[in-house]
């Protein structure tokens, strides 16, 4: 395997686990223990799945407008290197992160989705395959810890905290 490019190494280095917890009775804190079942109306849980499916499809399509449309105006994104706050800064960061990738694939599986009124939390496992313009590839399995808000009748991402479960990188063989 070839050495990672600087950009890939930078991306990996910032994906350390970090989560900020907002006040709520929902159970998505780091102290979350055992109660990983789905809670709340099925229609809301389905709408949140569709929100994250839209997010992942936009990653695959590298469609910045579709991707950022999933976020609340005051959303927060944390890849382990600190909070990125507000849609403008989140989009700017995403464009920088995505710039070296020719192809991306992202697929997610919810561990649980819990809804309480107009707030929700979920944890997701993701499988990500990335191909750089250089031809090098990277595979990552990650975990998102999310918070959502219903805003004007639609679910939006309020906060996403990402951590890497494992990653591999190298040249296509």
Positions of predicted regions on the chain:
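Bacterial N-terminal signal peptides
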Residues: 8-20
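A solvent-exposed, acidic/Ser-Thr-rich amphipathic alpha-helical stretch
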Residues: 51, 64-126
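Outer-membrane beta-barrel domain signature
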Residues: 71, 77, 166-169, 173
């Amino acid at each position: 395997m070839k050495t990672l490019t600087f950009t890939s190494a930078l991306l990996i280095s910032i994906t350390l686990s970090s989560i900020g917890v907002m006040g709520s009775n929902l159970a998505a804190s780091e102290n979350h223990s055992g109660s990983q079942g789905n809670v709340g109306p099925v229609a809301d849980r389905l709408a949140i799945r569709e929100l994250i499916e839209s997010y992942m499809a936009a990653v695959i399509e590298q469609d910045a407008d579709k991707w950022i449309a999933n976020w609340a105006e005051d959303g927060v994104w944390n890849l382990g290197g600190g909070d990125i706050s507000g849609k403008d800064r989140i989009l700017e960061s995403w464009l920088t992160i995505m710039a070296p990738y020719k192809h991306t694939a992202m697929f997610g599986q919810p561990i649980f989705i819990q809804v309480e009124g107009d707030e929700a939390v979920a944890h997701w496992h993701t499988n990500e395959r990335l191909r750089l313009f250089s031809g090098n590839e990277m595979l990552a399995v990650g975990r998102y810890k999310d918070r959502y808000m219903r805003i004007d009748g639609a679910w939006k991402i309020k906060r996403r905290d990402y951590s890497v479960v494992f990653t591999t990188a190298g040249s296509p063989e």
